[in-house]
């Protein structure tokens, strides 16, 4: 099975320009290719991971990746299938975000070894050197307005309005391809399926300006089995930056993937062989309640993104919280595991009587209910059941001198911080 066949078998090929020519190029020698990442935030997220890992698979097959950080295009904003204009960021912010994204990409691509080691480029380096007049004369003249307006990504915005700034975005992305081909002999661009219009602007410019053929391959935009856009948890993006989405939160995200999606995601997001995945699928289908596919997915992706130690910590947090063993976890681990539960910062004037604190922290709705909860054995401090109505919270209840975990019943948690 050649690399293109494997990508197809994994569900990673959505659309290509001349497929036969692309397969020929990939099987006859080393291809230099690029994927672009606009710094629209200070971190990449799971939605980017499909293209990143596809790039890694091609590198493992001997091809040479260029990771392009859009320091210039990030200042403009991509209109593709967006309902409204993006807010423009300052140059300083975009450059700062660009540096962070460069660091994240080095986790996945090999920038050190071999003749196909990855290269990092930033399109700000060339766009900052081109005057507006030169850009119009040397690039803009190759694009007709009719051609630009025919793109689906633009058509959808004509009704609501699109600025010239965003309208010109596709020409900038097209020029990226031309520049990388001219300087580094890059002949293939990889990106999300929503980028098709911008990406083919690059092949058009190559054909007209340099009489060369470029290839484009898009990866699918991933949705779950209900059609919901993939990569968000509770409406929030799942970030690759551990400070924005902890390894535990990412682990839980994968653990909660639906049965109908789990095996498909193993093919897309892990480097397990297709034969290994077929074995997992067989075991998984025989006992779905054991969630083997989800557990494997969580292990593989968290290890890939954050490392083995982070995976082990996420697994330990999961197991200890499930067993109610709060005291076996550090304050930092508890902050990861209980990041979504109510948090109350204890004030110096607060009563430390347990019944009072249950009401103050919003765990019980009233003192009467709080007393009943304590007497009925429904209240736990750091995993220990407390039935003393006169119990006073003390330093002994502080984990690492930072927090106390209170649980009411089986599932209602609150964290007291000091």
Swiss-Prot record:
GO biological process, alphabetically ordered: tyrosyl-tRNA aminoacylation
Residues of the S4 RNA-binding domain: 352-418
Motif 'KMSKS' region: positions: 229-233
PROSITE patterns registered for this protein in UniProt: AA_TRNA_LIGASE_I (PS00178), S4 (PS50889)
PANTHER family per record: TYROSINE--TRNA LIGASE, MITOCHONDRIAL, TYROSYL-TRNA SYNTHETASE
Assembly, per entry: Homodimer.
Job of this protein: Catalyzes the attachment of tyrosine to tRNA(Tyr) in a two-step reaction: tyrosine is first activated by ATP to form Tyr-AMP and then transferred to the acceptor end of tRNA(Tyr).
Protein name: Tyrosine--tRNA ligase
Organism from which the protein derives: Streptococcus pyogenes serotype M18 (strain MGAS8232)
Source species taxonomy: Bacteria, Bacillati, Bacillota, Bacilli, Lactobacillales
Gene: tyrS
């Amino acid at each position: 099975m050649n690399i293109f066949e494997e990508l197809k078998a994994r569900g990673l090929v959505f659309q290509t320009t001349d497929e036969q020519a692309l397969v020929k190029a990939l099987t006859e020698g080393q291809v230099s290719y690029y994927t672009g990442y606009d710094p629209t935030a200070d971190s990449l997220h799971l939605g980017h991971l499909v293209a990143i890992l596809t790039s890694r698979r091609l590198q493992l097959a001997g091809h040479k990746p260029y990771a392009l950080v859009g320091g210039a295009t990030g200042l403009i904003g991509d209109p593709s299938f967006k309902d409204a204009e993006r807010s423009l960021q300052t140059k300083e912010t975009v450059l700062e975000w660009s540096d962070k994204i460069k660091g994240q990409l080095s986790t996945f691509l090999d920038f050190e070894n071999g003749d196909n080691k990855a290269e990092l480029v930033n399109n700000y380096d060339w766009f900052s050197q081109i005057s507006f007049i030169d850009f119009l004369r040397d690039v803009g003249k190759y694009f007709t307005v009719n051609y630009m307006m025919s793109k689906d990504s633009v058509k959808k915005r004509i009704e609501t309005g699109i600025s010239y700034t965003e309208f010109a975005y596709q020409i900038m992305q097209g020029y990226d391809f031309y520049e990388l081909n001219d300087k580094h002999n890059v002949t293939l661009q990889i990106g999300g399926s929503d980028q098709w219009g911008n990406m083919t602007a690059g092949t058009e410019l190559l054909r007209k300006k340099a009489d060369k053929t470029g290839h484009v391959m898009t990866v699918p935009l991933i949705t779950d089995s209900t059609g919901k856009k993939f990569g968000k948890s509770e409406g929030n993006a799942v970030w690759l930056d551990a400070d924005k989405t902890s390894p535990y939160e990412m682990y839980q995200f994968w653990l909660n993937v639906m049965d109908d999606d789990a095996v498909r995601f193993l093919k897309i997001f892990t480097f397990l062989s297709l034969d290994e995945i077929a074995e997992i699928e067989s075991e998984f289908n025989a006992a779905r309640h054991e969630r083997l596919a989800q557990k494997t997915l969580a292990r593989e992706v968290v290890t890939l993104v954050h490392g083995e130690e982070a995976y082990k910590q996420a697994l330990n947090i999961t197991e200890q919280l499930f067993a109610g063993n709060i005291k076996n976890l550090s304050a930092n681990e508890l902050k990861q595991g209980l990041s979504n539960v109510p948090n109350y910062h204890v004030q110096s004037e607060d009563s430390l009587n347990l019944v009072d604190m249950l009401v103050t922290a919003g765990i019980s709705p009233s003192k009467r209910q709080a007393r009943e909860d304590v007497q009925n054995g429904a209240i736990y401090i750091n995993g220990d059941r407390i039935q003393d109505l006169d119990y006073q919270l003390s330093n002994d209840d502080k984990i690492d001198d930072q927090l106390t975990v209170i649980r009411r019943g089986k599932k209602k948690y609150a964290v007291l911080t000091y």
